[in-house]
């Protein structure tokens, strides 16, 4: 709903009619004059039409049944992780602060349990709130993906997306049947895309990050058509120092050969690291 209303306002449409359930989402677009109707009968009557008593009664009955099934408890916002929660880790905290201030990408390498994931999840907490235009764009992307809850209002904080290392290219970049839907790179627009265990991702997924990193846009071609979505994000990679994860750890003996270590990090291509 949100992207459609945004496009209508940009095209100069003066009044936008939506279902009552979609009114909260439609009204998030600045400049939108939204009219909400419970059923099509109200729309007919608004513009001078008349319905027979039987049709009007049937519409009211169907609408009341649908309203009774709708949830009435508003969702609760999840508390966002905060960098202030981190104790110690002064060098890592400073690296995050520099990355946040300059919009730099970041890679963290260390043994398991050293706090890489905890730190990455808290990077959005030190980024500035989204500008109004960016907030509408980010919210629109989540709406197109079908994961936006209008009851929470506009997304005003930089989003964080952290796909699993088994995620497919379609999940990370976007895709699906019919019109392609945005993937994690677009859902992280103006926020953070965090790839934990980065060398474990498939080479195809890692290589497909190069286009959005260079242009801030991702283009998806499917049989159902072509779609371009914004994808300007900060990339944070986390990796173990070797396949077994023990290299560099205190009191731990690495069992990997030098060849295994080279192969492990060779999955992160030079262009991606650049």
Model features per residue range: what roles?
Residues 164, 180-214, 246-249, 269-273:
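Conserved AAA+/SF3 P-loop NTPase catalytic/coupling segment centered on the Walker-B
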Residues 1-107, 111-117, 221:
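Peripheral, non-AAA+ core regions of ATP-driven protein-machinery
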Residues 160-161, 180-190, 220-241, 252, ...:
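AAA+/SF3 P-loop NTPase mechanochemical coupling elements
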Residues 8, 39, 96, 117, ...:
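Conserved RecA-like P-loop NTPase ATPase core
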Residues 178-180, 207-229, 248-268:
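Substrate-gripping "pore-loop 1 plus following alpha2 helix"
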Residues 196-198, 223-224, 237-242, 257-260:
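A short beta-strand-to-loop transition that corresponds to the Sensor-1 phosphate-sensing loop
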Residues 107-152, 215:
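Walker A/P-loop
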Residues 97, 153-159, 170-193, 226:
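Conserved alpha-helical scaffold flanking the Walker A/P-loop in AAA+ ATPase domains
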């Amino acid at each position: 709903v949100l992207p459609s209303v945004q496009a209508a306002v940009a095209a100069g449409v003066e009044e936008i009619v939506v279902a009552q359930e979609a009114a909260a989402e439609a009204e998030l677009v600045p400049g939108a004059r939204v009219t909400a109707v419970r059923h099509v009968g109200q729309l007919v009557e608004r513009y001078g039409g008349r319905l027979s008593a039987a049709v009007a009664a049937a519409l009211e009955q169907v609408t009341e049944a649908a309203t009774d099934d709708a949830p009435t408890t508003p969702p609760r916002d999840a508390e966002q992780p905060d960098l202030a929660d981190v104790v110690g880790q002064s060098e890592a905290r400073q690296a995050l602060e520099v990355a946040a201030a300059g919009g730099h990408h970041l890679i963290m390498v260390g043994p398991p349990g050293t706090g890489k994931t905890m730190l990455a999840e808290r990077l959005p907490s030190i980024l500035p709130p989204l500008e109004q235009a960016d907030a509408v764009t980010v919210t629109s992307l989540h709406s197109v993906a079908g994961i936006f809850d209008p009851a929470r209002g506009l997304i005003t904080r930089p989003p964080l997306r952290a796909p699993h290392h088994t995620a497919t290219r379609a999940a990370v970049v976007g895709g699906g049947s019919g019109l392609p839907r945005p993937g994690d790179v677009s859902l992280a627009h103006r926020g953070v895309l965090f790839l934990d265990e980065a060398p474990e991702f498939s080479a195809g997924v890692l290589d497909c990050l190069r286009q959005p990193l260079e242009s801030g846009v991702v283009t998806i071609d499917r049989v159902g058509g072509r779609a371009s979505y914004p994808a300007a994000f900060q990339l944070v990679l986390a990796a173990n120092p070797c396949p077994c994860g023990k290299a560099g750890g205190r009191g731990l003996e690495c069992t990997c050969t030098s060849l295994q270590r080279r192969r492990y990090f060779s999955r992160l291509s030079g262009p991606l690291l650049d």
